[in-house]
């Protein structure tokens, strides 16, 4: 997010896709124990990291837009999304990542979808709670773009809210569109709702 990169980190947000590509070009070989000699626009690196017995961890990028998804497919292992609804995952995220991974000859198709989740008998109260808790995300351009693709006014519109069976069905349906992992961001208007939501999510763990 531009406001984070510039205002909090004091870095340039001028070319975020180029910056991420170069970052991964440096980091991925280092994680594999290979030496790196890199002179670029954002980084100048000469060196290596040696961790005896270590193996490279999976690297996932919070890639949402088309160009960042393509960089992710070419160099990393997958993406972690937020404020991205099921239609956008099905029609944008998953196919864009898969096509770019196929083109690069890589299996970088991991999609971790994070969404707000609440098991409740009072849908309207939960929607109001979601609108309050997650309002800031609808104001950040990257998330706003994903909400617009979904036709959602705000994060509450893509929250998974309902009875235990309804929530379970909606979470499981994500696997059918190519989501490989689900990250539940639990919330509730009451302590009981939070507890019921946690119990439901735990019951779905595989």
What are these regions (language model features)?
Residues 1-206:
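Active-site-adjacent structural elements that line small-molecule/cofactor binding pockets in enzymes
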